[in-house]
């Protein structure tokens, strides 16, 4: 099986993860398509006007999310990082079950202020949350080089995808935890904002999305290859 970096693959993230050897990735991003908050709010017009684009995307069960996290744990190097996007609902209810039986530790969190309000019965959602996970052993020296990143980050984005993410924040996190030409992994890439962040920082993107993407994963004879 051969896979190339800096390609927007249209594929199941599990298929891509199974191609990656153990302990090879320094930094990954994971933005699961969960529906916990939608089930909680239970809007009657879900899938019509409100959030139609989001509702049309394939939803991940909790078991699927746990499966992704365990595979990401397997491929991450010791003291490597995984950046996990969550909303307020999952932040409050906790992600302990997601990282159970892995070597991931919660070491930090960044609040992304999107600059516009979303849904909510009481307070309106304006933020998303990026949980910073580090694989054991936990350490900052030599693993995190940018100490100027604030824990509340304001960045407006042009919405090209229901889950558009802040490229400038991702760029700072990528450069803080990797070196030029290192591989950055995103197995549920959505609008491929991590791809853009990698290209702009001189890193190699390895990722896919089940719906979006330009190229299918192809089986070929040969060893796993990660090349631009």
Regions of interest found by a model, annotated:
Residues 5-7, 78-82, 183:
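Short active-site oxyanion
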């Amino acid at each position: 099986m051969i896979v190339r970096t800096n390609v927007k693959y249209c594929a199941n993230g599990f298929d891509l993860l199974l191609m990656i050897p153990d302990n090879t990735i320094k930094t990954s991003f994971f933005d699961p398509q969960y529906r916990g908050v939608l089930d909680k709010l239970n809007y009657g017009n879900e899938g019509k006007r409100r959030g139609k684009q989001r509702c049309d995307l394939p939803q991940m069960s909790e078991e699927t999310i746990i499966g992704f996290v365990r595979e990401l744990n397997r491929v991450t190097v010791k003291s490597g990082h995984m950046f996990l996007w969550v909303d307020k609902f999952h932040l409050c209810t906790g992600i302990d079950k997601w990282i159970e039986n892995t070597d991931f530790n919660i070491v930090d969190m960044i609040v992304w202020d999107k600059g516009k309000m979303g849904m909510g019965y009481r307070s309106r959602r304006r933020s998303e949350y990026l949980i910073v996970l580090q694989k054991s052993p936990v350490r900052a020296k030599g693993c995190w080089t940018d100490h100027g990143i604030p824990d509340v980050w304001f960045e407006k984005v042009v919405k090209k995808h229901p889950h558009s993410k802040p490229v400038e924040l991702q760029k700072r996190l990528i450069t803080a935890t990797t070196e030029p030409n290192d591989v950055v992994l995103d197995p549920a890439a959505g609008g491929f904002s991590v791809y853009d962040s990698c290209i702009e920082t001189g890193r190699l993107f390895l990722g896919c999305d089940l719906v979006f993407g330009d190229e299918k994963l192809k089986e070929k004879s040969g060893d796993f290859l990660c090349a631009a």
